[in-house]
Amino acid sequence: MSIITDVYAREILDSRGNPTIEVEVYTESGAFGRGMVPSGASTGEYEAVELRDGDKARYGGKGVTKAVDNVNNIIAEAIIGYDVRDQMAIDKAMIALDGTPNKGKLGANAILGVSIAVARAAADYLEVPLYHYLGGFNTKVLPTPMMNIINGGSHADNSIDFQEFMIMPVGAPTFKEALRMGAEVFHALAAILKSRGLATSVGDEGGFAPNLGSNEEGFEVIIEAIEKAGYVPGKDVVLAMDAASSEFYDKEKGVYVLADSGEGEKTTDEMIKFYEELVSKYPIISIEDGLDENDWDGFKKLTDVLGDKVQLVGDDLFVTNTQKLSEGIEKGIANSILIKVNQIGTLTETFEAIEMAKEAGYTAVVSHRSGETEDSTISDIAVATNAGQIKTGSLSRTDRIAKYNQLLRIEDQLGEVAEYKGLKSFYNLKAA
């Protein structure tokens, strides 16, 4: 009864109006699962391959009909007949079917769509919530959210080099209260920007994209918004950032070019000094991709300098890849990994990366992409793995809010068992 009988993929649109893939899996019993695949704007050099058509006459070359065909004509034939509950075997079968190290033949987007749909169909068959199916019945930790309320870099057309300026409501007692705090700060920020004649239009992830005088001004205006909302910076709400430094690193010169803000060129050592100054001045608890993904020597220096007091998250650095993460752990580089399901391409590999991180004392931050859908699977993954942190955008745009609303439902379902750890989510820091 739990045998897969049909697999069907179609081309849909993501939150940026670009094509992506949606997959449906059906079983003998009538159980059903659907998975939608996100897409990134700033992508790591070593990410699994997102298969696009390249036909400029259609969606500017961004169509995914090849990936859709790969699901409907190749993957479907291979996995029909499998028990939908055998997630690992199905994921491994798709990896073998692709046969490349980066899923470049079938496409990570094709494979991931199936992987998510299979998990959802299995949960439907067993009549349990997805987070319980994926994580068992010890799932209880609601993640502390990183809320991206000012967008810059590749996510916005403005004068800010850093890609994301985020708040984390660590002082909240529950996820529900954390969400309220975040929303109140978001609206306070809107009022401040409007009063200064600055834009309150939003970027890809729902945050504001104002033209500020410097990168540092992003932190200053957020501190002001936290206080305006009635909270204490550093106690109730802390700051986090995603520099996405690979996006402004000049490989030929070997320097970081802060061109959007006009702050000029900086060496690796100067960037590290810059982060030290920011951390001493503002309640910043997390820095993501502070240096270029290939600047491992620089990352080692950064970790030695700030690793005890600041969460140093590897996104482009690790690309949710256990080989990359294992190398980083061995060399003492960073102390956290960003988890993006489409960087690696299956749920099995995603869970392996989270487990490896935790065993090494690294935190795992489950993350969305800038091109999202209404699919809220990452909310269930965050709870299923007791990851403790999630990054899923600002307090606007339904594609972001869908994840937060799912977490509200999960917290309600868990009832008294639910835990919101706030500052204790940073078990990788001595100060926390």
From Swiss-Prot:
Family in the record: Belongs to the enolase family.
HAMAP family for the chain: Enolase
Gene: eno
Binding site for Mg(2+): D242, E288, D315
Cofactors, names only: Mg(2+)
Pathway assignment: Carbohydrate degradation; glycolysis; pyruvate from D-glyceraldehyde 3-phosphate: step 4/5
Primary site of residence: cytoplasm
Taxonomy, superkingdom: Bacteria
Species this chain originates from: Enterococcus hirae
Name of the protein this chain belongs to: Enolase
Documented activity regulation: The covalent binding to the substrate causes inactivation of the enzyme, and possibly serves as a signal for the export of the protein.
Keywords: Cytoplasm, Glycolysis, Lyase, Magnesium, Metal-binding, Secreted
Cited function: Catalyzes the reversible conversion of 2-phosphoglycerate (2-PG) into phosphoenolpyruvate (PEP). It is essential for the degradation of carbohydrates via glycolysis.
Residues annotated as catalytic: E205 (proton donor), K340 (proton acceptor)
InterPro entries membership: Enolase, Enolase-like_C_sf, Enolase-like_N, Enolase_C, Enolase_CS, Enolase_N
